[in-house]
C-alpha cells in the first residue's frame, strides 16, 4: 500500500454534502449546450495538469475547492445521462498524453539499443511510467482526501458501471478509467484496512436494517426472518473500513449444520434445532449468501478476503469444524438453456439437448413438442408443479447444468460468475443439488438447482493457482460424471 501511509486517515468515508438526486429518466439524452459548456469549464478547472517530470514532487496540490467544485457539480446532476456525459468527457479528454508516451517509449528503446548503464535506463523507464498515468487519476487522488471523498468515488464508479451497462457511455477510454478507479479502490479497501464484524440480534438496528435491505441472494422477508439469520446455528459477518467501523461493505451469511446442506429452504425457512447451540451438532459451515452493499466496489476482492477471514474466525470458535462449503445459486442457467432451445426450435427436427427417450417422456406429460413447451414452462417455473414432469427433467437438467458450470467458458474461465468467483478462491466444484431452491426466483433463474463449492483448506492455494494460471477446474466425481453424460448424450 505504498503512497498511502498516515495520509489514509484523511480518507474519511463520511457522507458528502451535495444536493440529493431526484429521480429522472434513465434513457440516453444529450446534455444541453449550456450544460456541456459548464462541464468542459469545470473539468478544465478541476483536473490538475500533469507537472513536468522534474517538478512532479515540487508542484503544490490543487486547491481543495477545485475538487469540491467537481463533487458538488457532479452531485447536482439529476439524470444518469448527464452523469454519464460528464464521466465520458473526463475519460476522453483527461487521460494519457499519447504523444508523451510515444516519446518516452522511443527514448527507452534507444537507450536499450545503446546498452547504456542501468541508472540511465531505469530513469527513462520511470519517465515512461510517469507518462502513462492519466490526468484524471490526479483528480481522483485529490478527491479521496476530502471528507467523504472515498465514498463519493465508490458511488461515482457505481454510476460509471451503470452507465456502461445501459450503454449511456462506451468506448476504450471509459473502460480504462473504470480500471484505473477500480485499482485505486482496491488499494484503499485492501484487507489491512478492513475490520471483520459479527452481526447478532443485539447489533445496532441500522446495521440489521442495512444488511436486510442489501441481501441480494435470498431476500429477507421480515424482522423474524432476519432474527433467524443471525440467531443460533447461524453466523453473519461483514467487513467495514477502518475509518467507518460498523458500516457494512460486504456481508457473508453462514449456516452451521450437521453436514453440507443441499437445500436453501432448510436454511432460510426452517427454525434451528434448538435455541442453544450444541457444538456436537455442528460439523459443517455453509456459506449461503454473500452480498456487496456498494456496487462501486464490484471487482474489488472483498468477498474473497471475507471468506478467508470468516473461516479463521469459525476455526477459532469451533476447532473441530472440518467442512467448509458454499451453497450457491446458478444465475444465468435458465437463460442459457432457453437460448439453446430457441436456436434449436428454429431448426425443425433438430434435437441436441435431450435423448429420444427423454423427448418422448417429456412430450407425454406436456402433450406438446418438447422445445416449445419447455420454453414456457422453464420461463415460468410451472414445470415444478408436475411431479411427473419434474422427474422426467431431472436427468437432462442435471447434466445440462453440469456442462453450463464446467464447460461453458468466457476467455477460458467459467462463464457463470458465481462459479468463477469460488474457483478463483480455490474451491472445488463439488455437488449439484436437485430442487435445492424451490422459490420462484430459484426456479426461473436456475431451474431450482444449486451447487456446492467446497473449500478444502489445504488445497485452496494450489487449486486457485491452477485455475487462474492454467484455467483448470477442479471438480468432484459427481460433476465429472454429469459432464461425461452430457458429452455422450448431447451434440453441442
Swiss-Prot record:
Q: What is its EC number?
A: 4.1.1.9
Q: Which cellular compartments is it found in? A: Cytoplasm; Mitochondrion matrix; Peroxisome; Peroxisome matrix
Positions bearing N6-succinyllysine: 167, 221, 385
Summary of the tissues where the protein is detected: Expressed in liver, heart, skeletal muscles and adipose tissues (at protein level). Ubiquitous. Strongly expressed in liver, kidney, heart, skeletal muscle and adipose tissues. Weakly expressed in brain.
Q: Which residues form the active site?
A: 328, 422
Q: How is its activity regulated?
A: Malonyl-CoA decarboxylase activity does not require any cofactors or divalent metal ions.
**Leading EC class:** lyase
Q: How is it modified after translation?
A: Acetylation at Lys-471 activates malonyl-CoA decarboxylase activity. Deacetylation at Lys-471 by SIRT4 represses activity, leading to promote lipogenesis. Interchain disulfide bonds may form in peroxisomes (Potential). Interchain disulfide bonds are not expected to form in the reducing environment of the cytoplasm and mitochondria.
Pathway assigned in UniProt = Metabolic intermediate biosynthesis; acetyl-CoA biosynthesis; acetyl-CoA from malonyl-CoA: step 1/1
Any one GO MF term held by the record is: identical protein binding
InterPro entries per record: Malonyl_CoA_deC, Malonyl_CoA_deC_C, Malonyl_CoA_deC_C_sf, MCD_N, MCD_N_sf
Write out the entry's keywords from A to Z: Acetylation, Cytoplasm, Decarboxylase, Disulfide bond, Fatty acid biosynthesis, Fatty acid metabolism, Lipid biosynthesis, Lipid metabolism, Lyase, Mitochondrion, Peroxisome, Transit peptide
Q: Name one GO cellular component term.
A: mitochondrion
Here the transit peptide covers 1-38
Q: Which domain of life is it from?
A: Eukaryota
Q: Which Pfam families match?
A: MCD (PF05292), MCD_N (PF17408)
Motif annotated as Microbody targeting signal, chain positions: 490-492
Q: Quote the annotated effect of residue 210 to M.
A: Abolishes catalytic activity
Where do the annotations place malonyl-CoA binding?
A: 298-304, 328, 422
What is the role of the protein in this entry? Catalyzes the conversion of malonyl-CoA to acetyl-CoA. In the fatty acid biosynthesis MCD selectively removes malonyl-CoA and thus assures that methyl-malonyl-CoA is the only chain elongating substrate for fatty acid synthase and that fatty acids with multiple methyl side chains are produced. In peroxisomes it may be involved in degrading intraperoxisomal malonyl-CoA, which is generated by the peroxisomal beta-oxidation of odd chain-length dicarboxylic fatty acids.
Q: How does it assemble?
A: Homotetramer. Dimer of dimers. The two subunits within a dimer display conformational differences suggesting that at any given moment, only one of the two subunits is competent for malonyl-CoA binding and catalytic activity. Under oxidizing conditions, can form disulfide-linked homotetramers (in vitro). Associates with the peroxisomal targeting signal receptor PEX5.
The entry's protein name is Malonyl-CoA decarboxylase, mitochondrial
The record lists the organism as Rattus norvegicus (Rat)
Gene this chain is encoded by: Mlycd
